[in-house]
Amino acid sequence: MVGREKELSIHFVPGCCQLVEEEVNIPSRRVLITGATGLLGRAVYKEFQQSNWHTVGCGFRRARPKFEQVNLLDSEAVHHLIHDFQPHVIVHCAAERRPDVVESQPDAASQLNVGASGNLAKEAAAIGAFLIYISSDYVFDGTNPPYTEEDIPSPLNLYGKTKLDGEKAVLENNLGAAVLRIPVLYGEVEKLEESAVTVMFDKVQFSNKSANMDHWQQRFPTHVKDVASVCRQLAEKRMLDPSIKGTFHWSGNEQMTKYEMACAIADAFNLPSSHLRPITDSPVIGAQRPKNAQLDCSKLETLGIGQRTPFRTGIKESLWPFLIDKRWRQTVFH
């Protein structure tokens, strides 16, 4: 369904230009995306926009000109944004997602991951909007996978704790909200450092220098466009069925260590991998990580919700713009 609004546009004709008022179609379903400048947020914004939703994204440092600039710690600004736009759905992607940064800046991380999330849930409840809070597999300690939504969380690091506390703040302030736990993400990055998966590409490409790669932690790399599709499917199902709420899991289904991901990346681009060295010891530097926090996704699958991109396909799409050897890019893609 769409509504109609009037919009001004400039028409150029020989000798003059005219300001013309035209009717344009505006989708009637409204969605607000927080963290829309980030890797996941960009994908979620694109997914809803291309599916005929009236989509507004907000960010902070990189917001302008495409997105609304909003500090989520400013409760008054958040209130005005939500009450002015009146979204049917809010997808809350904004977070401090880097475990080591959370350890070094715990107060700032807690304000964003917990405080801002609870406030957003309260504002969503006030206008009857369906809130999807993006959480993490790091709420589990990784000792007894796979984890269902009913398993009791036990985070190992402060990042996992802030995400779990964020879940509690959301569900306490909004009984109709949904929590979507997801694992490590990758996708169309603006820079390699944007994802813990894509950041390995330089080490893969510089084959003249050996590189140590973690071969201890089991990960399930998941494409952001798959998570975005799940968010949209969840939102559309909720608009038909108010019982869609609570906690859900989504994840890719290919189990890999960072070493195995790096080898798969090398293989996808026909690059050598003999310089990559698997390290099987538990990492001793940085925030503690769960060994295997695999998520059981059967709850969403039973609802008919899901999408999975094979890792080799997704990583090739994501990384080819960062290829150092441009000859390979030309022969494969042109």
UniProtKB/Swiss-Prot annotation:
Q: Which domain of life is it from?
A: Eukaryota
- Cite the binding residues for NADP(+): T37, G38, L39, L40, F60, R61, R62, N71, L72, C93, R97, Y159, L185
Q: Which family, according to the similarity comment?
A: Belongs to the dTDP-4-dehydrorhamnose reductase family. MAT2B subfamily.
- Keywords assigned by UniProt, alphabetized: NADP, One-carbon metabolism, Phosphoprotein
Give the molecular function GO annotations.
enzyme binding; methionine adenosyltransferase regulator activity
Q: Which GO terms describe its biological process?
A: one-carbon metabolic process; S-adenosylmethionine biosynthetic process
Give the gene symbol. Mat2b
Q: How does it assemble?
A: Heterotrimer; composed of a catalytic MAT2A homodimer that binds one regulatory MAT2B chain. Heterohexamer; composed of a central, catalytic MAT2A homotetramer flanked on either side by a regulatory MAT2B chain. NADP binding increases the affinity for MAT2A.
Protein's recorded name: Methionine adenosyltransferase 2 subunit beta
PTM Phosphothreonine: list the residues. Answer: T309
Q: Which SUPFAM superfamilies match?
A: NAD(P)-binding Rossmann-fold domains
Q: Which Pfam families match?
A: RmlD_sub_bind
Gene Ontology CC: methionine adenosyltransferase complex; mitochondrion; nucleus
What does the UniProt record say this protein does? Answer: Regulatory subunit of S-adenosylmethionine synthetase 2, an enzyme that catalyzes the formation of S-adenosylmethionine from methionine and ATP. Regulates MAT2A catalytic activity by changing its kinetic properties, increasing its affinity for L-methionine. Can bind NADP (in vitro).
Pathway annotation: Amino-acid biosynthesis; S-adenosyl-L-methionine biosynthesis; S-adenosyl-L-methionine from L-methionine: step 1/1
Region described as Required for interaction with MAT2A: spans on this chain: 319-334
